[in-house]
């Protein structure tokens, strides 16, 4: 029986039985909002969806909405406060006046993740979080579990922050499904009860501080991924991350450590490590040695260690893991080749929305000062100074764009030349005008995309389109 846990408002955790006769409010008509509204409507709930954007901006999205769902657009009216519970979109601040009033009125607010999982029948949940690497790791782990599920006659889904809402995958009809979920701090902070069989925290460095308000609050959000596990569950942690080591004392489940350090093999507590370019796993009293996926950088070796170790904990066989590794393709927008123009190699790393991600990308760049670095977007409140050593070692010049440009220039112009561009298209043109064959142009923004783009995917695709346009122009000339 599930424990009686509470949410901010003091209400019980979400259970379909308890809330069945209460009207559901869904705040936001994004992917997760539409998906959870449809899920609830399909389960017989009365659903009211409220969206602050105008009808013109969300009309296409609403076409996918169940016809029984009531809607309002262009703002939130008092009708939202007549509902029995609410489901909010990820990223909506708890300082939002509507959320504050909901809590004051005693109306519980849940995440799409928690509500969706409440309808899943006996799922095997593997949940992945971390500041960086969670998309690659989730996709890798999801591919392993698809192969494993096929041998068990079960279904497998990869969902969450990768763009596939949990609610869209959960139909409640598949018993014993394997669900691999990438969960952001936004999603976790609103989940009062999730209990993965396997939880994964890859690393924790400053990010989303403008949303959470402090590093402490950000860490507390991440910890929710394991807080409700028990001794029969597993928690996979990065032994080289100091915050992971510190929080391990709060983990109620069995901890499995992975490490990329040179002496990891000598430490008996380490369950997965790298030796001679191979991945070594120690689990269940056995030792397995696998070839890593064909991906650049030590960070991807770490991602593979985490994915493989998690899969073993979930019952996958070494051969299944190896098959997934052998066939794994790079994640879009993460150190992704975008094209070559005038001998300059352009790299799309639009998913790098924080400084630590940029550090990972820079480590994968060629030696010597051959890299042009495009930074900028909406500032997230973390310093850019940690970039200085690698910038001085590898970066020829920085091109800044977006709202954060003045802040970036203030912190980094003393160690490398900085030029400001009106947008990323102009940034590409500046590099083509000043660079030379053999250089690399790395688009790794270190900022969110919301100043000019829908999301990092939109930003990355626009960047690739610009590079293609410039390459096509070169061929025509």
Language-model regions, residue ranges each:
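Short internal beta-strands
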Residues: 46-53, 235-239, 372-375, 394-403
